[in-house]
Structure formats: structure tokens, C-alpha cells
């Protein structure tokens, strides 16, 4: 499971600066979800093959109401959700009573915590450690967040005990390559043992709990509750038609007979973790509310993670034909960026259309993990280039030479060529659509990556040998004499 790190501390100790520096290591910054969180900011980052979720909390003022109200509003939830807490203090301001109050609270929570002495510019790190020793939380880690000093040591302390990403090859290992002429196949993995992992996500009150209970209904063969490795997510293995599945339920434990949707406490962290751990994401929307910005934010999470996607429009029953037509138009207009995903109109409460989700889950998963040989992908590339060539750049045609598979779930197709940095986005979309159509991919995003060919002689000065210099002089002399003879004849 992806570890969660929370940044806590007084106002203006540099939490946001550190947050920005850490999340800048990846292009995907989750940012604020207006309306879902109050003063907390969520981001994703990666360090030495380890992905992690970062939470930036608002400052804890430390006044008579600060510890109660502020901590209850934002920092308390962040601490509860976190695997590691980074307690930031200001080395320039020194030890304060508010720091002591925060330290006491962290000790009561029994959370793995590190004191981080920020702003050690022009300050002796050893003096900073001694300054905050009375907190009783071990040696402080000195950093200068604004300049990036000490960040490596900080991340080593926070993340060294967590495993590398499952899909990240360990150092010295190479990714499996499909040999020439080999048939496309599914590569067995953890999902083969536990079944397809399905994360059901969506805004509060759209029917996630109802859908979970409906999918685990009377026709189930095997079902049991098993607490997952996160604080609230529940992993529920079950079978349907001899196929194994595991539901990742972020809505919490509920009684089996209780199928009405309760008002849920939305947790961005639980959703992010469920998406990361899933093979397929079922995204639930409320047909009566249509597409809202929060839906687009959550879809963005799933897209960034590259997970296969199925969209379920819930509460479809009871809507008039005109209302249904309006919703379909809105879906087509606002969800154009996930047009690869199957859309199902369901009623989780009554079970209408729920059974159809399984076929889409199976097809999406198969598309996401199938592998193809290099010869197949290269042939598709050659056909695409033949039908529609890349544009000219500085009077030179962009050359795309061959393609191979770079990863699965999502499929990553690596294309080698020249001037690849100048391939326009429109042509990238053309290639994505071509591969999707020819390979018949459904329900999964696809990523195109380019690699340029290295010129081994680039930067080398062309030095001629003495023999080559003499030969060049003879040729130049011969050309001059020939030119003179031609002029004399005229």
C-alpha cells in the first residue's frame, strides 16, 4: 500500500515550501479539492522507486483554542491517516510552547514521527538538534526546505522502511520483454491469485456503499470481510461465475443487510490508495446531479494512476426520458477525455444493470495487462506512419523507427526515432487512437513514450589523417585544373 506522510507544525514553519519541493519531483500534483477538504492539500511524489502520498496541513496556532479546533479540523485527520508524521519546527524561531503542545499530542497518538528542523540556513545543524531535544522525539533532522538541503536524509528516514513499488523493477533487474513472434499474453501476477482488484470510488452519497453490497449480494459464492493494510479500507474477496475478484471498499464496514447509502466521510487518502492498489476502477456518479467538478478531479486521479476504468451512472431509475437524454449529452460533452471507458447506467438499489459491470471489468483488465511482441507494435507504427506521416521540422521529416512495450496497466508503448521531442501532441493522439483501434483496447488509458537515438559521434571533431589531408588536396587541385580547362574551351 502506498505510504502516507503528513506535514504538521505551527504556521509559517515551511510546510507548504517542503510540500511544493517534494511534489515537484513528479508532474502530477493533486492539489486542493475545493469543498472536499478544508485546509489540507494532497500530493503524490516518488523517491527511489517508492511512491508516497503527501498531506500538507494548515498551521496549528497553539493558542487556547488552537490545539482543539485546528487539530480537529485538519491536522488530526491527517495524523490519523498518515503512516509517518513529519513534525516541522522553525530553527530560526527556536523552541516554542506550541511546539511542545504538538509534540505531546503526537506522543499520545503513538505515531511514527520525525522532528524536522527547517530553515537551518546560516545555523549550525548541531545547535538546531540541541534546541529541539526537549521535545523528546529523538534527534531533529535539519533541512533547508527552500533550497533543498537535507531533503535526501529526510526521505531516507521517512521512507526507507517501506518497500519499492510492486510495478517498479528492483535495481539491477530488467523488465520482461516479449520476444519476437511470441503471441500476446497476460502476464501472471498478484491479481491472478487474488482475482481482479476493483476499487469503487466516487463522491460521497453517490451510492458506493449500495453498489458494494449489491455486488456482494445473494448470488455470491464466497464472501468474507478481511481488514486491509490501511486504516479504513476493506478488502473483500468474492467469486462470481467462477471468476475471482477483490473489492477494495473505501466506504468502511457496514452491516450486510444495510443497503441504503449513508452519508460517508470522504477521504482523499483512502481514494488515492484504493486507486493505486486496484487493477480496475469503477467510478460511480449520481445521475441526478450530473457531472460536477469533483467528479473530474477524481477521474483525474484514476487517469494519472493509469488504471483501467469503468463508469457507473447510478440512480438511473425514476428519471424521465428527457432527463436521461440531457445526462447523456452532458456525459459526452464533459467526459470526452475518458471516452475509452465503458459507461453503464445502473440502479445499485434495485440491481438494474449492475451485472453488466463485470464484463466491462474483465475486458478492461485484459486490455490493461495484455502484452504484444515488438514486431506487432512496430508494424502498427509503420502502417500509421504510412497512412499519415509525422510533420516536417526545419525541413526535416520526423522519423519514427520502431516500437516496443514499456509496461502494462496501463499499456506503455515506447517509440524510438529522431527529433522525437518535436512530435506534436496532435500526432501523439493520432498514434494513441491508432494503437487503441488496432489492438482493440477498451477501458484502459494508453501512454506513448518516445526515445531518441543517440549519435555516438555527436560532439566529436572530425580529424583527418595525413593521408586523408593529402588526398583532399589532390582532389581539390584536380578540380581546379578541370574547371580551368572548361573555361579555356569556352
From Swiss-Prot:
Keyword terms: GTP-binding, Nucleotide-binding, Repeat, Ribosome biogenesis
GO biological process, one term: ribosome biogenesis
Protein name (Swiss-Prot/TrEMBL): GTPase Der
EngA-type G domain mapped to chain residues: 3-166, 196-369
UniProt-annotated stretches for the region Disordered: 162-189, 453-490
Residues reported to bind GTP 1: 9-16, 56-60, 118-121
Gene3D superfamilies, per database record: 3.30.300.20, P-loop containing nucleotide triphosphate hydrolases
Organism: Pseudomonas fluorescens (strain Pf0-1)
Function statement: GTPase that plays an essential role in the late steps of ribosome biogenesis.
Highest classification ranks of the organism: Bacteria, Pseudomonadati, Pseudomonadota, Gammaproteobacteria, Pseudomonadales
Gene label: der
Quaternary context: Associates with the 50S ribosomal subunit.
UniProt feature, compositional bias: Basic residues: 470-490
Residue span, KH-like domain: 370-454
